[in-house]
Amino acid sequence: MEQFRNIGLLGRMGSVQVVETLKRLKNYLVGEGYAVILEEATAAVLPGHNVQVSSKKMLGEICDLVIVVGGDGSLLGAARALAGCNVPVLGVNRGRLGFLTDITPTEMEPQLAEVLSGKYVEESRFLLDAYVKRNGEPVGYGCGLNDIVLHPGKSTRMIGFDLYIEGQFVNSQRSDGLIVSTPTGSTAYALSAGGPIMHPRLDAIVLVPMFPHTLSSRPIVVDGNSEIKIIIGDYNQTYPHVSCDGQTHVTCAPGDTVTICKKPQKLRLIHPMNHNFYQICRDKLGWSSSRDQGGQ
């Protein structure tokens, strides 16, 4: 297992709980002899920290491990910044669901001690790139660990578009939009729109129509290396948006083309040894268990 010496810390701003957890975490790591590097915005909320400070981009270049304190949204933002750096990322949950951030604050020190001693599970999670072109010229780009979503923005009108997968025409669709999700994102927005849950190790992409006008338009699961092309009808009277993880946005125009494909660089996500995807689904999604009723 990889030896961690230089550890970067990154936290969600605007939360007292996150700041307190960051202080605890920094003091613990320094006390254990690790070199701690704070992301610059994180350092601003920890006055008197007395450790090195770095930009988010450089954090991935100089650290052996980056620990993100916050919710899944915080880790999504970190993933987009760090995926190209080949640095492992670990999440401490200070949000609500915590599908990605699975170190608990109440057991943070013992769980971290296990991870730092080499007892952890590592996963590779792929991201999606989205390229927007207008009259053949690039006008926007974004990437997402969870999903790329075409939606009407502030408009209440449906969007008309043509869908192609690997150059093959799939259908013409009128709907509120389309969610193009990774397995990581299948338990997020795609799930609420009726998409399937995919195991994180699957090399697949799911396309989930949002309130389609044709009821036979159903979610489609395709190979993870597929190129997905959406041609926004030039007859539309609205300017749709392309959102990446719900955090970055590109405004499109009628006639634009959105091309979505797997990002070459992957996120290295690490978990404690007891990480169990199905246990997380039971806990976070309220799945029942016969064990809860005294079954075997």
Swiss-Prot record:
Catalytic activity: NAD(+) + ATP = ADP + NADP(+) + H(+)
Origin: domain of life: Bacteria
GO cellular component: cytoplasm
Gene3D superfamilies membership: Probable inorganic polyphosphate/atp-NAD kinase, domain 1, Probable inorganic polyphosphate/atp-NAD kinase, domain 2
EC number, as in UniProt: 2.7.1.23
Active site (record annotation): D72 (proton acceptor)
InterPro entries assigned to the protein according to its UniProt record, in alphabetical order: ATP-NAD_kinase_N, ATP-NAD_kinase_PpnK-typ_C, NAD/diacylglycerol_kinase_sf, NADK
Coiled-coil region list: none
Chain residues that bind NAD(+): D72, G73, N146, D147, R157, R174, D176, T187, A188, Y189, A190, L191, S192, Q247
Subcellular location: Cytoplasm
Keywords: ATP-binding, Cytoplasm, Kinase, NAD, NADP, Nucleotide-binding, Transferase
Protein name, as recorded: NAD kinase
Lineage, top ranks: Bacteria, Pseudomonadati, Pseudomonadota, Gammaproteobacteria, Oceanospirillales
